[in-house]
Amino acid sequence: MGNLRVDVITLFPEMFSAITEYGITSRAVKQGLLQVTCWNPRDYTTDRHHTVDDRPFGGGPGMVMKIKPLEDALVSARQATGASAKVIYLSPQGRKLTQQAVKGLAEQESLILIAGRYEGIDERFIEAHVDEEWSIGDYVLSGGELPAMVLIDAVTRLLPGALGHVDSAEEDSFTDGLLDCPHYTRPEVYADQRVPDVLLSGNHAHIRRWRMKQSLGRTFERRADLLESRSLSGEEKKLLEEYLRERDDS
């Protein structure tokens, strides 16, 4: 896992300034850990209207992105990044993007992301060129740009040196298959609500145990499905039972 180059084929390259100019991803760009390059299919059209879409065969609402501008943009992206780059189409039909999948993508040196628009892109382009399809959730968006930015942000967090603290990525939600524990900062008391005493104790073993217990309990209450695919250790089972006991007694 090292530096990452991401090439994005998009009709709205300006949207990706949110990645290159703000936050952790911007810092990664400035540090040379991340490179983001956009390719606009409109730049590969030959008609005066720069047409990138057309009506779907068989009828129906909306428009479909044409193959040729997408294919020509992909050729340019491949020439710039190398033929081995994995091509990913952001699509509601794709597999759901998980932290485990993000870890796999972070192992790549380069990615080419296809951000569709309208009713989608011509299926023949997908069959000929796309290696993987990924979805960020079971809902419909206006285009693939936001999912592409979500993917870039998630992958960037795993690049060595991208985060301010070496442990930050490892302690994120889902990294260990669990939701994150609650977090607190100063003041210790606000509107009569106190920070849990254990976090002020300075006892790192007790703090670690409390955080794991909260993480397990939160996952059980909010995303029990995550526990179905995770084998709990003896300590984790004990902590979850303790959490549920304390919850029921309160």
From Swiss-Prot:
Reactions mediated catalytically: guanosine(37) in tRNA + S-adenosyl-L-methionine = N(1)-methylguanosine(37) in tRNA + S-adenosyl-L-homocysteine + H(+)
Protein's UniProt keywords contain Repeat: no
Domain of life: Bacteria
E.C. designation(s): 2.1.1.228
BP terms from Gene Ontology: tRNA N1-guanine methylation
GO molecular function: tRNA (guanine(37)-N1)-methyltransferase activity
Cystine connections: none
Residues binding S-adenosyl-L-methionine, per UniProt: 116, 136-141
Keyword Acetylation among record annotations: no
Subcellular location: Cytoplasm
Top-rank EC class of the record's enzyme: transferase
Keywords: Cytoplasm, Methyltransferase, S-adenosyl-L-methionine, Transferase, tRNA processing
Record's GO cellular component terms: cytosol
Principal location: cytoplasm
Subunit structure: Homodimer.
Record's function text: Specifically methylates guanosine-37 in various tRNAs.
Family of the protein in this entry: Belongs to the RNA methyltransferase TrmD family.
Name by which UniProt lists this protein: tRNA (guanine-N(1)-)-methyltransferase
Organism the protein comes from: Pseudomonas putida (strain W619)
